[in-house]
Amino acid sequence: MIKSNLTELFSVEDQQKIEEEQNRVLIFDGHNMAYRTLFSAIFMNPEDNEKFFFWRHLFMNSFLNTIVKFNPSKVILAFDTKGSWRYKIFSEYKSNRKVARDKAVVDFEKFFPVFESFREEIKEAFSTVYVLEYPHAEADDVIAVLCKEKFKTTQNVIVSTDKDLHQLLIEKNNQQFDPINNKIVTCINPKRELDLKIISGDKSDAIPAIKPRTGIAGAEGILKQGIEDFLEEEGNEQYKDNYLRNRVLIDFNFIPKDLAEGIINTYCEYPIGEIESSKIMNFFTKNRLTKMMEEWQNFGPLIKSLK
């Protein structure tokens, strides 16, 4: 007699593992992956600074290999858009990025149009993947809103090296995969890490500490004292606005409501459809991804099965 359900076929522990795999959402921080593979591409092949074909190979190789590794039921590829809402809160937000780009060996004036076009080509060819962005939102915002509002009961794996996303690990159904070190991120106390970052600031995003010259050690002391007691202490009232500013900039719980609603609507209305082999082949051919085209039969069924 053929056994017809999980209860008859597998142990309780195995059933749980299977159900988790069937409800696993893989969420890529698209810009994080793009820049990580871009600098690797230029380092390994400095001549790839005009058409960026080697970068395209590294990007897609990382993307597809990670999908195969985690075998998800759904894939989200989230990207930033220009003019983040955070600039209205703090005009110096990420002001250090342009300086870094100007010093970089990458020709960003040539890269950005290629990147924008490449994103649209992925969206067109890989029609079972949610390629998401929303005006004035960063990829972090898209990831955070979906994890908090749409993926509360699924097993979510966030693919990024960005430590800002550690706060999402407060919820036990969220994991973060570090593609550089090829391992799941270990974060013992994500809530405390978030509180420390709000107090000490984030140099990578040009967000200053709430009090000048306050690093992690100083932030630890403030937390031990109690943030409310610290801010109410005589002479410290001036730091309250800085604290409130940093909370809004860093804590995903302060993403504007209208932005969150827009992200959710964009996800819910996204036109997922069956993959057309001709579009996939055209994508691989146009972007000189010959080896991937040859291997499509190996990983293609998994990509086609996404929903």
PLM features: residue spans?
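Noncatalytic, basic helical substrate-engagement surface that gates or grips nucleic-acid strands
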Residues: I2-V12, K17-N156, L165, I170-I184, ...
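AAA+ P-loop ATPase catalytic core
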Residues: V159
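Non-catalytic nucleic-acid-binding/docking modules located in mid-to-C-terminal regions
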Residues: I2-F10, I18-Q22, K69-F79, K94-V106, ...
